[in-house]
């Protein structure tokens, strides 16, 4: 399943790359990418692991970029 998220307070591309590398290692994640302006993140993941994946994603984002927040993007 592919889901999109709004990303707030991500300060630079270097931190975004670090976040991408760590999230790619999370069990259940197939693919991740940030938009060019770093305000949106798209994650392709297994349906059965959405909750566990997103708990890790939020922790990774906040640890690498202090104050970074991730919110589900409703279509």
Please tell me what each predicted stretch does.
Residues 36-42:
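Short glycine-rich, basic-tinged beta-strand/loop micro-motifs
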Residues 33, 62-75:
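Conserved short beta-strand edge segments in small beta-sheet-based binding/regulatory domains
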Residues 13-17:
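Conserved redox-active cysteine motifs that mediate thiol-disulfide chemistry
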Residues 20-35, 67:
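Short acidic amphipathic segments
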């Amino acid at each position: 399943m592919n889901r999109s998220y709004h990303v707030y307070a991500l300060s630079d591309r270097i931190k975004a790359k670090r976040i991408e590398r760590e999230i790619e290692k999370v069990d259940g994640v197939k693919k991740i990418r940030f938009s060019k302006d770093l305000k949106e993140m798209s994650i392709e993941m297994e349906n059965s692991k959405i909750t566990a994946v997103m708990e890790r994603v939020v922790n990774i984002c906040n640890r690498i970029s202090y104050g970074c927040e991730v919110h589900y993007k409703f279509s």
